[in-house]
Amino acid sequence: MPSLAKQSLIRLLITTLVIFSLTGCDYMQSLVGGGDETTNTAETPKELVTLSLAVAPYIGWMPWHLANEEGAFQEYRDTHNIDVQFVSSDYASTIRKFINREVQAVVISNIDAIAHFVREDVEADVILVMGYSNGNEAVLISPDVDHFDIRGKEIALSQNSSRHYLLDRYLIKNQIDFDSVSIQNTRDIDIPTMFVSGKMYGVVAGNPNAAKLLNEQQAQLMFDSRRIPHEIMYLLVARREVLQENPFFSKVLLSAWFSVVERLQGSRKASTIRAMAQLAVIDPDNFTNQLNTVELNDTPIKSLSAIRNDRLMRRAMRHIRYFVERHELTGSEPFTSWVSYPGRTPALIHFNAKPLQSYVTQIR
């Protein structure tokens, strides 16, 4: 048996190799001058800078709300002259606020980011892949239906969203013609009412609406995002020019996120779940069940691996591109200008690994 000292040394060497394997490409890229990513040389502003983050109160995004409740965003206010304001609003409003420059960062799905930001020519950096939908969105059918046949039926959903994408993927997988299904464009907050009205054959909902309809209205599950793993991603996005002018902004955001999610795998998991459930106004067991439908990247190393996994993102992008182009969501912008990956010249939406890479290096 090796000594404790040798075991500790081995663990340190393994961790160092993992970090280097994840960050080395970016480092070599910077040596040869490739790419044009936002750097993360965080210098403290001379005067107080006020920036803001908008997050909808979805279950998988409640760590942000708890971080705000615990004062995580204000940790660097006095020492680094950066005041991060937290804005909680419905999902559509958070997206609109980001586009209108009312907030500088937003939590959003990859599909919604492309659908909304590319057409508006918004230059934005993805600095965190928080996780993936793993059952968090679902196609739900009335409990009175005894045979699933969606052809010729009407479905309520938020058009051109990740829920719309999920329905398209169901139709493709089951070789059902798109035109055989009618879409009733419905705001997410109105989905439960539309389902209960009985006017629709079904709805496409995300949690907490999906869980509510399954539990309280005996909705039947026809299809959910577990069938398309890692295609619907949840992202932390910031305006590129803001990150360039205020590189410390990313550290505040990343610190706030990990201050909560890292507790979900340790002895403080139960108390953290209870705190988030209280903010979401549901019981802890229900909260846990809904949280399990989101595959979280709950450590900095796991998150860095995710944002650098361009192979996974490119594979998902093949399906997303078809959806976006079929619905003409990006206007005249060519596909090559939509999304770019770490170490490449930034497109409109750029997966920028440097802030997270810097964060990982600093916490070791």
Regions found by a protein language model. Name each.
Residues 71-80, 227-228, 299-312:
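Short, solvent-exposed loop/beta-turn-alpha elements that line the ligand-binding surface or hinge
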Residues 28-185, 201-207, 220-222, 230:
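Short, glycine-/small- and polar/acidic-enriched structural segments
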Residues 112, 184, 189-281:
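Pocket-lining segment of extracytoplasmic ligand-binding domains
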Residues 320-364:
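Conserved C-terminal helix/tail region of periplasmic/extracytoplasmic solute-binding proteins
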